[in-house]
Regions:
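Non-catalytic, solvent-exposed segments at the cell envelope interface
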Residues: 2-15, 22-29, 39-498
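Hydrophobic secretory-pathway targeting helix
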Residues: 33-36
Length: 498
């Protein structure tokens, strides 16, 4: 039987060319796959060696304070890390393999955090180079000074202090950028805890996390300070700060009873003068009937006062409001007794807890033959201003002058701190602000915005209307008992259909 056309075509169809094409396609895929792997791995290895050389060069340059060379090396390391990161894209399939995948992901995270951290460090070195220029200009004056970590801010003559502060002030944007990038690096490193990696790897990463965390904390504090340096230090014009020593052993809504206050005058980056006094010394002059300011009703009910005195000014739990009240009441009392009314540009409130932390860093201070240590600071100071002054033959009105002497001594110590100890001091400031042991207020609107954005102002927000309750404690005539009391507060909100 004859075959038809279709059968004939089917039987004669060749099969070898199809197989050959299949093998060719598979071969091309293998070649491309191998090439991509070799290219990706080669790029990663090359970049790793290059980055290692750059990092080693940066460390060596930093050891000799050659900031420009260090910055060049850091820039090279950043580019190498970016090259390695792009190399990973060619072998991305490795990330889907069991066990190996976690290490692949860790490499991505480390490179991302390294790039963020490197870019932050690059910007910091830009500032260091500018500061180095100021130091070079002062070379003749500072001939006997070595800038090696034992170097202190107090070493500089006033004109060079001012120039250094101006550099920081003008570079505040770079400091903010560095802080942001360090936080990004910190966030990337935190992702590693979710991966299944070796303990040895985690130990090494832990060290890196600690360094990045310390740097991030430093720049989170330094950046707003730099932006507000004119308000802080009087770079362009003299500034005067009202210091409120808030005794948290006698709690008030604004932080603590104001037993002592101070006026700190700053001019061109230097402390011009600091005056510290007992609040009762000014309050006693307005006890006459001619002076009257309506006090908050609880002060009348529980303390029996007939007017609002400066010592009770911080009644509001909103630190900005209590600062405004403190400024107003102090100025009114000065005016009433015929004394020059102080122009106040800002308020710094701090509790004894801040002093304890600072002493824990710099060590004990001896003032008027009395040793103040971090563990016993509050008790010793309390004893001296309530009892000990009598044994030393000091009058009642002068019993708190020791606080002024203590502040003078403390400022001398802080300005003499080696540069390499500044990050620890910034850490104390950061923790004290977060714990609300320290608060800041400025009469300048722009500066106050900086404080608010940084979380330093401790304002009571009224933006949210879903939470209308606030707990604010106040010690009303119970003396200095809060230091020994423990509190437990249960704050619970239940929602219903309405």
């Amino acid at each position: 039987m004859d075959t038809n056309f279709i059968q004939q075509e089917f039987e004669e169809a060749p099969t070898r060319p199809k197989r050959r094409r299949t093998f060719i396609i598979i071969g091309i895929v293998i070649i491309l796959f191998t090439a991509s792997v070799l290219f990706g791995v080669g790029r990663i290895v090359s970049a790793a060696f290059s980055a290692g050389d750059d990092i080693e060069g940066a460390v060596e340059s930093l050891s000799t304070l050659s900031f420009a060379e260090a910055q060049e090396n850091v820039g090279g390391a950043i580019e190498s890390a970016k090259s390695a990161r792009s190399g990973l894209q060619f072998i991305g399939w490795v990330g889907y393999l069991p066990w190996v995948g976690d290490y692949f992901e860790s490499a991505e995270i480390l490179l991302d955090s390294g790039i963020s951290g490197g870019e932050a460090f690059y910007e910091v070195l830009t500032i260091a180079i500018e500061i180095e220029g100021v130091i070079d200009d002062a070379e003749d004056i500072l001939a006997d000074t070595t800038v090696d970590g034992s170097y202190t801010f107090e070493t500089f003559p006033d004109e060079f202090k001012l120039e250094l502060l101006q550099v920081l002030h003008n570079r505040s944007d770079e400091l903010y950028s560095a802080a942001t990038k360090l936080n990004l690096a910190q966030g990337e490193l935190a992702k590693l805890s979710e991966l299944d990696l070796s303990d040895n790897f985690y130990d090494k990463i832990g060290d890196a996390e600690e360094v990045v965390s310390d740097l991030a904390d430093t720049f989170e504090i330094l950046a707003p300070i730099a932006q507000s340096l004119d308000a802080f230090a009087g770079l362009e014009q003299d500034r005067q700060w009202l210091l409120l020593f808030l005794n948290n052993t006698e709690i008030r809504p604004g932080g603590g009873f104001i037993g002592v206050y101070g006026l700190l005058q700053m001019s061109e980056g230097s402390v011009e003068q600091i005056f510290v006094d007992d609040t009762y010394n000014i309050d006693q002059y307005v006890e006459d009937p001619e002076y009257f300011v309506v006090p908050p009703q609880p002060l009348v009910d529980y303390l029996g006062v007939d007017k609002w005195y400066f010592r009770d000014a911080n009644w509001s739990p909103d630190f900005a409001q209590s600062s405004q009240d403190s400024i107003a009441l102090l100025r009114q009392e000065f005016a009433h007794v015929g004394q020059p009314v102080p122009q106040i540009d800002g308020v710094l409130g701090l509790t004894p807890t801040v002093m304890e932390r600072v002493l824990g860093m710099i060590g004990p201070l001896e003032v008027d033959g009395i040793t103040f240590e971090p563990e016993t600071f509050t008790e010793v100071l309390e004893y001296e201003v309530e009892v000990g002054y009598k044994d030393r033959g000091i009058g009642f009105e002068d019993r708190k002058k020791i606080v002024g002497t203590l502040m003078d001594t403390l400022l001398d110590e802080l300005f003499s701190l080696p540069i390499d100890e500044w990050p620890a001091l910034f850490g104390i400031v950061k923790s004290s602000i977060e714990d609300k042991q320290m608060g800041l207020y400025s009469t300048d609107e722009d500066t106050q915005d900086v404080f608010s954005d940084s979380g330093w102002a401790h304002e009571v927000s009224t933006d949210k209307i879903d939470d209308i309750l606030l707990i604010a404690d106040a010690n009303m005539g119970a003396l200095k008992t809060d230091y020994a009391m423990e509190r437990e507060v249960v704050y619970k909100i239940d929602s219903d259909e309405n």
